[in-house]
UniProtKB/Swiss-Prot annotation:
Keywords of this entry: Acetylation, Capsid protein, Ribonucleoprotein, RNA-binding, T=3 icosahedral capsid protein, Viral nucleoprotein, Virion
Native source species: Alfalfa mosaic virus (strain YSMV)
Main localization, broad class: virion
Family recorded in the similarity comment: Belongs to the alphamovirus/ilarvirus capsid protein family.
N-acetylserine: modified positions: S2
Annotated region (Disordered), positions in chain: 1-24
A GO MF label: RNA binding
GO cellular component: ribonucleoprotein complex; T=3 icosahedral viral capsid; viral nucleocapsid
Function: Capsid protein. Binds to the to the 3' end of the nonpolyadenylated viral RNA and is involved in viral RNA translation initiation. Probably binds RNA and plays a role in packaging.
Protein name, entry field: Capsid protein
Subcellular location, record wording: Virion
Length: 221
């Protein structure tokens, strides 16, 4: 039986060392997926309706633990993408409410600015400070919240707006109780209150999470 006949009708032989090495090399060259990927739930109406507002649940319960004892960096970002005949960004008010159950008494600190996709600052600083376009407030019922109005652009009527906003929050575990090796925070849900024209389009959301690698990252304010 010729080699071609063997390939056509014969049984497949065992993979050679060379083919195994090639397969391993090919697998190693494939792009690695993100270390941690959080599924995003479709927006749904919640039990917190308010007149003139749209409440949406943008995530499922999420538990984060610090394996190095330093802290956890939580990055929440969302993209508002809508179109309308006369929609102004100044007519949009967003309120993000983070519902958190800590495993112990800790502190929150904002590590990065809240910026639009083209780099314009929306909010920055400490969670308890006022911002140019927004403010962090302690919320006894939910944890803490960010309230801001989208920046205004003169003469931008009759256009499609697409901006992304991100909030990077650092959970500082300095206040962890003695003997606690892996403190954690549970993000019960992230809510967004959107107040805009009824014809405003959908709100698409993305939640990403990353752990802090170095203690220096905790000092970024």
């Amino acid at each position: 039986m010729s080699s071609s006949q063997k390939k056509a009708g014969g049984k497949a032989g065992k993979p050679t060392k060379r083919s195994q090495n090639y397969a391993a090399l090919r697998k190693a060259r494939l792009p690695k997926p993100p270390a941690l990927k959080v599924p995003v739930a479709k927006p749904t109406n919640t039990i917190l309706p308010q007149t003139g507002c749209v409440w949406q649940s943008l995530g499922t319960p999420l538990s984060l633990s610090s394996f190095n004892g330093l802290g956890v960096r939580f990055l929440y970002s969302f993209l508002k993408d809508f179109a309308g005949p006369r929609i102004l960004e100044e007519d949009l008010i967003y309120r993000m409410v983070f519902s958190i159950t800590p495993s112990h008494a800790g502190t929150f600190c904002l590590t990065d600015d809240v910026t639009t996709e083209d780099g314009r600052a929306v909010a920055h600083g400490n969670p308890m400070q006022e911002f140019p376009h927004g403010a962090f407030h302690a919320n006894e019922k939910f944890g803490f919240e960010l309230v801001f109005t989208a920046p205004t652009h003169a003469g931008m009527q009759n256009q499609n707006f697409k901006h992304s906003y991100a909030v990077a929050l650092c959970l500082d575990f300095d206040a962890q109780p003695e003997g606690s090796k892996n403190p954690s925070y549970r993000f019960n849900e992230v809510w967004v209150e959107r107040k805009a024209f009824p014809r405003a389009g959908p709100l698409r959301s993305l939640i990403t999470v990353g752990l802090l690698d170095e203690a220096d990252d905790l000092d970024r304010h």
